[in-house]
């Protein structure tokens, strides 16, 4: 509150374990626009993906504006990971053809959403019930910024990186 932040309480129908971020975002957008008029963009920073700097946020916003995007997400280079899924004990490769396996160096670049920064126009989420849509852009972050907090162990990993000032500075 000291810096102008305002709490927006979710109504009970979107304040349970199965509620989506999109529901909460649409509610918040509607509340803000009701009180302050139309807004141009939303910058959504997930608390469970804390490895970002103010410079990351500024650069992502500039990329969004300069490229006239409708939505943008932050991501990290997956460094040629070969990903599989297991459905009912049936393994299937997701991002490459294992029967025609290429060298990792010859694979196309792939990125993983890191959940750290999302920027979008309010109309995108209102029309699609999704924070991504229209002309989508990507803001690439350092690989170590892919960590999320989902477990107690993740807290320690993120704290490690957050305390490494030589890594965080200008990255």
Language-model segment annotations:
Residues 1-38:
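Conserved N-terminal catalytic core of the sugar/cofactor nucleotidyltransferase
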Residues 2, 18-23, 41, 47-136, ...:
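Conserved core of the sugar-phosphate nucleotidyltransferase
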Residues 26-29, 33, 61, 65, ...:
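A structural alpha-helix within SAM-dependent methyltransferase catalytic domains
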Residues 30-35, 66, 127, 131, ...:
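Secondary-structure boundary motif
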Residues 46, 119, 148-152:
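Alpha-helical architecture
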Residues 138-140, 145-171:
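Hydrophobic helical membrane-anchoring modules
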């Amino acid at each position: 509150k000291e810096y102008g932040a305002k709490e927006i309480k979710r109504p009970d129908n979107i304040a349970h374990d199965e509620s989506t971020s999109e529901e909460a975002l649409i509610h918040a957008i509607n509340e803000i626009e009701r009180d302050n008029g139309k807004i141009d963009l939303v910058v959504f920073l997930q608390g469970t993906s804390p490895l970002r700097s103010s410079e990351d946020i500024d650069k992502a916003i500039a990329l969004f504006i300069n490229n006239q995007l409708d939505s943008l997400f932050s991501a990290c280079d997956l460094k040629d990971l070969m990903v599989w899924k297991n459905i009912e004990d049936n393994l299937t490769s997701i991002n490459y053809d294992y029967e025609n396996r290429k060298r990792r160096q010859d694979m196309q670049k792939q990125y993983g959403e890191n959940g750290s920064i999302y920027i979008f126009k309010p109309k995108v989420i209102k029309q699609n019930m999704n924070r991504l849509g229209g002309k989508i852009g990507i803001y690439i972050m350092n690989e170590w910024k892919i960590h999320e907090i989902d477990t107690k162990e993740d807290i320690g990993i993120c704290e490690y990186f957050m305390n490494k000032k030589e890594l965080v500075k200008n990255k």
